[in-house]
Swiss-Prot record:
<dbReference type="GO" id="GO:0006412">
    <property type="term" value="P:translation"/>
</dbReference>
<keyword id="KW-0689">Ribosomal protein</keyword>
<dbReference type="GO" id="GO:0003735">
    <property type="term" value="F:structural constituent of ribosome"/>
</dbReference>
<dbReference type="InterPro" id="IPR050063">
    <property type="entry name" value="Ribosomal_protein_uL29"/>
</dbReference>
<keyword id="KW-0687">Ribonucleoprotein</keyword>
<dbReference type="GO" id="GO:0022625">
    <property type="term" value="C:cytosolic large ribosomal subunit"/>
</dbReference>
<protein>
    <recommendedName>
        <fullName>Large ribosomal subunit protein uL29</fullName>
    </recommendedName>
</protein>
<comment type="similarity">
    <text>Belongs to the universal ribosomal protein uL29 family.</text>
</comment>
<dbReference type="InterPro" id="IPR001854">
    <property type="entry name" value="Ribosomal_uL29"/>
</dbReference>
<dbReference type="Pfam" id="PF00831">
    <property type="entry name" value="Ribosomal_L29"/>
</dbReference>
<dbReference type="InterPro" id="IPR036049">
    <property type="entry name" value="Ribosomal_uL29_sf"/>
</dbReference>
Length: 64
């Protein structure tokens, strides 16, 4: 997800996006544990997306 897209979203939308990514991360972990995961690079991508969104949330809360 691009930073420009994320900056346009409200705090509530960003929180929903984090929840969606956390669920996806959990599902990836379950697939990896069952040896069904082929794309291991998704862990890194999702983890970084979550960090990006959390950083934006912190910025938005400090500004408002």
């Amino acid at each position: 997800m691009e930073l420009k897209e994320l900056r346009k979203k409200s705090i509530e939308e960003l929180e929903r996006e984090i929840l969606k990514l956390l669920r996806e991360q959990f599902n990836l972990r379950m697939h990896a544990a069952a040896s069904q995961l082929k794309e291991t690079d998704l862990f890194k991508k999702i983890r970084r997306d979550i960090a990006r969104i959390k950083t934006l949330l912190t910025e938005k809360v400090r500004v408002s």
